[in-house]
Amino acid sequence: MPAIVEKVLRAGEGRVVKRLHRVAEQVNALESDFEAMNDEELRGETVRFRERLAAGETLDDLLPEAFAVVREAARRTLGQRHFDVQLMGGAALHQGNIAEMRTGEGKTLVATLPAYLNALSGKGVHVITVNDFLAEYQSELMGRVYRFLGLTSACILSRMRPDERREAYAADITYGTNNEFGFDYLRDNMAWSTAEMVQRGHNFAIVDEVDSILIDEARTPLIISGPSDSPTKWYGEFAKIARRLTVDVDYEVDEKKRTIGILEAGIEKVEDLLGIENLYESVNTPLIGFLNNAVKAKELFKRDKDYVVSPNDEVLIVDEHTGRILAGRRYNEGMHQAIEAKEGVPIQNENQTLATITLQNFFRMYDKLAGMTGTAMTEAAEFHQTYKLGVVPIPTNRPAVRVDQPDLVYKNEQAKFAAVVEDIAEHHAAGQPVLVGTTSVEKSEYLSTLLTKAGVEHTVLNAKQHEREASIVAMAGRKGAVTVATNMAGRGTDIILGGNAEFLAVQAMRDKGLDPDETPEDYEAAWPEVLEQAQASVKAEHDEVRDLGGLYVLGTERHESRRIDNQLRGRSGRQGDPGESRFYLSLTDDLMRLFNAALVESFLTRTGIPEDVPIESKMVSRAIQSAQGQVEGRNFEIRKNVLKYDDVLNRQREVIYAERRKVLEGEDLHLQIRHFIDDVVTAYVTEATARGFGEDWDLDELFEALRSLYPVSVTPEEVVEAAGGRGNLTVERLLEEMRADAQACYDAREQELGETVVRDLERRVVLSVLDRKWREHLYEMDYLQEGIGLRAMAQRDPLVEYQREGYQLFGAMTEAIKEESVGYLFSLQVQPAAQAGAAATPPGFGAPPVRQQLQYSAPTAEGDVEVHAGDAAATDADTGNRAQRRANQRQQREV
């Protein structure tokens, strides 16, 4: 089905490209006009553009002139002039599309065009990159263009304080990673005052490497979580038990689906080891999760592939898509603790979700979204379906001359790597730079050992050397360089033949102590000479490497996604340079073993094929394509499923966050609180009068319940007497009496404390209760989703059931917010400001919760990111029926 959709989406490609080409021609026609201007006149165009916008013109009206201004500014500040194809890419981005541009076509420079144009509105532009280094590097380099034209630019980094973040978001153009933008959104919706909030809206986002961020990383939501009180001792116990269980005897493993199942023999063995009679008895239910995680940690999570153990005994996740270490991130649902127990390192506490959103729903909040990548067309259907984004392939500035050699397939991994080492040594001896792609830290280190034995000097780039990533990649195109890398080499930094002059120049400026923000004038004055020196140092080597055939890219294994293979290939042959690529495969590679086991078995049993001779077979090539198609289809379904369930929560989140923002922005809650009182009293009375008539109702019990809510000023006898006897007492009469009594008591409360104090108390109470109840609701929704799949066994649609029960839970939460807010407002002991000499500060509501260590789950490899700041979780969740909750609330409100 996606293939058919893809064909339909590509049908109008030619017309779109022609339209974009006409835009480039319009810009070219204006070029000489802006070339003739001096710097001051060119800078003044920004003011004139803004005046024209204020007068009613649109951004589309300004596009040709604005693009021409940016092109001229880039030529003067960076020494770079936008090519026509870059103008076309910029126009595609402005129109809210994904521009598919080959590696080396200058996507970073392309982003300056729509970023400048859309920043003229004053609403801000966000440029999203894949890591902090690229965000800082691009902001620093392209910021010179923006500053020249009178705009401000900034960068959001993980180490920044809230006040620095707020200042960065106030800039016209803000660079940062998807995680930083997403977590700031969640933190803003956990803030206790508008002064703590840092973002100013979501106007226009340009996502660099858009397929990596919106596709690869979209399977796992962003989650902020805080420590829970779950015990850690069981992880160690079950790690020992898992070591005593045998695969295919006590449990079974499905590597393809990454699932495990405990068999009957295993259950009996676990029960014997624990000394219990029935593992599935309700009291033992939590132990099942510990058991499953322990076996998963043993069988499905491999050291130096899925994670590494640092020298200080910390388990660090390795990003499955990029090969980078995810510093501080942690698997959720107890998985990380199970791995820590397996490795025998200190076990850290589990976490409770405080705020969450998927990347899909975060980016769909932007008024306009656009993206750039070298590999988007294979996912055009998903981009259109999920984000309503079109994919526009932009022509290359120069014809691509890279030669993609056919795959070489060997019977086993040993023979494959022997051939790989031989091929690398041959190209290295000739002086041709070689980039070798591997799929894991383990494989990169294995190949490094083989190359060392063969006497081939090389550099390894994997999760363990991530801090040197940019410098290694930037120099990977130098003569004779051999770089062994995991997927991380596929993103961000260009591999330029002879070396990256811009990278060298930026590094040299930093070495001189020059900063574009601290010393902008000195920076601008020194830049041309430093850049010229860097360019001269690499030019001669560039020509020499070009004559040797350019960069040779060698892949040691096919990835699960065709895009990642294409990204690796795309490192070579940039800007019309020569290049070559080839993949070496074996029949025992994970992709073949898991998805085409029968074919692998048939080839392995053939005795006539020598191990050191590659297999040439169209059947093998088709099998590889089929396997990648299966994985891509499966991952697409996972992402769609994540989004379907989050859409349910997203609607609830929008309601809660909107209410929360009203409170923060100072909306008068007086009328809302009055409605709360009526609603809660109505609920109490309705529950007490659900059966029978006036003579049957237990008014004493009702009044006792109401007294736990507010100081009731009437008695049951007075109400009955006013009605003319029990027989005349109706539900409507009782409701009218009790609502009036509650409202009168609140009037007295307001008169006692003063209107100003009560308004402040209302804001603090509602905010605190809303936050706590929302956290409890997230926990309940998580719990609901965990088991909802079992409804399919009863012929029920799990999603429909999740929507139905989620709606019920949300309704119960809103009622609980009303009930607790009313109870606190009546019961909290408040010292009036006149007596205290300061603003009223009710205990527990006078300030935000104590700040504590939080966990941040990022959208890759199902991990969590740890950041040492954040709002603490409020008091524990209330449990039980309404009567039990009332008792708990009374205890909480005692001062």
Swiss-Prot record:
Topology class, membrane: Peripheral membrane protein
Keyword Membrane belongs to the record: yes
Family matches, as Gene3D superfamilies: Helical scaffold and wing domains of SecA, P-loop containing nucleotide triphosphate hydrolases, SecA, preprotein cross-linking domain
Catalytic reactions on record: ATP + H2O + cellular proteinSide 1 = ADP + phosphate + cellular proteinSide 2
Keywords for this protein: ATP-binding, Cell membrane, Cytoplasm, Membrane, Nucleotide-binding, Protein transport, Translocase, Translocation, Transport
Primary localization class, coarse: membrane
GO molecular function, one term: ATP binding
Residue numbers spanned by region Disordered: 838-895
One GO location term (cellular component): plasma membrane
Documented EC number(s): 7.4.2.8
SMART domains xref list: SecA_DEAD (SM00957), SecA_PP_bind (SM00958)
Subcellular location: Cell membrane; Cytoplasm
Binding site for ATP: 86, 104-108, 494
Family: Belongs to the SecA family.
HAMAP family given in the database record: SecA (MF_01382)
Subunit structure: Monomer and homodimer. Part of the essential Sec protein translocation apparatus which comprises SecA, SecYEG and auxiliary proteins SecDF. Other proteins may also be involved.
NCBIfam families reported in the protein's UniProt record: PRK12904.1, secA
Protein purpose: Part of the Sec protein translocase complex. Interacts with the SecYEG preprotein conducting channel. Has a central role in coupling the hydrolysis of ATP to the transfer of proteins into and across the cell membrane, serving as an ATP-driven molecular motor driving the stepwise translocation of polypeptide chains across the membrane.
Protein's recorded name: Protein translocase subunit SecA
